[in-house]
């Protein structure tokens, strides 16, 4: 029996690595933490007065706008909008399942 010859590996489709050296392993980022907003869940006198005086003058009125400007929760902003609608201070522009858009009431 003849001794076996060492066979060369078949040529692969990938090119051979050119000795690049060791690369540093990428670290995971810590991720950004969103700042907690401490919005009110009930109206106090000053905020309610501000709502009645300033909100009807806004060109665009949505629950998110009121929540951001008056520092109130989203559910309280929706209730405030219903109150302003009942008073006739604002009028509806568009209503959708997830977003309601209002504007100031004009004398038309």
UniProtKB/Swiss-Prot annotation:
Coiled coil: none annotated. It holds the Pfam family Ribosomal_S25. Disulfide bonds: none annotated. Keywords: Ribonucleoprotein, Ribosomal protein. InterPro entries: Ribosomal_eS25. Residues 22-31 have a biased composition (Basic residues). One of its GO terms (molecular function) is structural constituent of ribosome. GO terms for cellular component: cytosolic small ribosomal subunit. This is Small ribosomal subunit protein eS25. Residues 1-36 are annotated as: Disordered.
